[in-house]
Regions:
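TerminUS-proximal long segments
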Residues: 289-303
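C-terminal or internal capping secondary-structure element at the end of a domain, subdomain, or sheet
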Residues: 279-285
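Soluble ligand-binding/transfer domains with enclosed cavities or grooves
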Residues: 24-266, 270-275, 279, 290
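Intrinsically disordered, low-structural-confidence terminal and linker regions
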Residues: 1-48, 300-303
Length: 303
């Protein structure tokens, strides 16, 4: 029964992509270029991608999601305003481990549970924690660069798994891209069967040294969430899901660590909040979570 429900749910998502998406040539929007996934994503997708594309996989504690935050610099963003600890996290992500707690809106919790239970687990991708203590044993954080022959970092892979369940929470590919009429954005690509979910996040540097990454816009071509489906070898359907927005607020804490509030909204309604405590330590493993309720009380409100 679970398999049947999952198949129906996946078919419905594809139907929405075909109904609401625009048909495009793959090369017509390079800022959306990204790999599409097989039926199961799992832990090795990025290595298979590297092998197929002739890319070198580089690992190490100094590997970061962005080789240099200055890649995001524009008239509206100055990376030199970022707090050193925030900048170091993005440029040397492999040095850090993460603890995470989740808080779902009661209104959207049943939908989230069904989507993760019937779809995410089948494809081994995007298994958001449904309960605050679901990641109490910690989560892995494996960062690897995919580099072409010229030495250019094409994508940075960031794989995060729940140490308790072994489920893949995220298997994402990170880069920068500039949508039409916008400055450089953080680009994240989450491969899914026959396509991907691409999120373009507009950066903001705040006076306190914190960083905001915002995925929201009004029309196709703005930062936001794009659901992409491969239809033919060189053709895709691209659905700009305007109602789905995200906000990341990354800020330094007084104890020297970094914290992140991640808000997901649907047409302005709160869906999910994730809070990350990011500390320097053994690469690839996060420490056991302690008292999430007390920790969550320290979360800043990010609107």
């Amino acid at each position: 029964m679970r398999r049947l429900i999952g198949t129906v749910a996946e078919a419905f998502i594809l139907f929405l992509c075909f109904l609401l998406g625009r048909r495009m040539d793959r090369g017509s929007a390079p800022w959306l270029d990204g790999p599409t996934g097989p039926r199961r994503i799992g832990t090795d997708f990025h290595r298979s991608l590297a092998a197929d594309a002739g890319l070198e996989v580089r690992t190490g504690r100094d590997v970061g999601l962005l080789p240099d935050c200055a890649q995001l610099d524009s008239d509206g963003f100055d990376s030199s305003r970022l707090h050193p600890s925030v900048r170091d996290f993005y440029e040397h992500t492999g040095r850090y481990h993460l603890d995470v707690w989740s808080q779902w809106s009661p209104l959207f919790w049943p939908f989230g549970w069904a989507l993760i239970h019937f779809v995410s687990r089948r494809m081994e991708q995007l298994n958001f924690p449904m309960y605050p203590l679901e990641t109490a044993q910690g989560m892995t954080s494996d960062v690897e660069q995919l580099v072409d022959r010229s030495g250019r970092v094409v994508f940075t892979s960031w794989l995060r798994r729940n140490l308790g369940s072994g489920l893949v929470i995220y298997s994402g590919l990170y880069a920068t891209a500039s949508p039409p009429g916008h400055g450089p954005c953080v680009k994240t690509v989450f491969p899914v069967p026959r396509g991907n979910a691409t999120v373009l996040l507009r950066p903001e540097a705040n006076a306190d040294g914190s960083l905001k990454l915002i995925s929201s816009g009004r029309r196709f071509g703005d930062p936001g969430f794009y659901r992409i489906t491969a239809t033919e070898p060189n053709r895709i359907r691209v659905w700009y899901v305007r109602g789905l927005t995200e906000l990341f607020h990354v800020y330094p804490d007084s104890d020297g660590s970094v914290r992140t509030d991640h808000h997901v909204r649907w047409w302005g309604l709160p869906v999910l909040r994730l809070h990350y405590h990011i500390t320097l330590g053994a690469a690839g493993r996060s420490a056991a979570a302690l008292e999430p309720p007390a920790d969550l009380r320290r979360v800043r409100r990010s609107q």
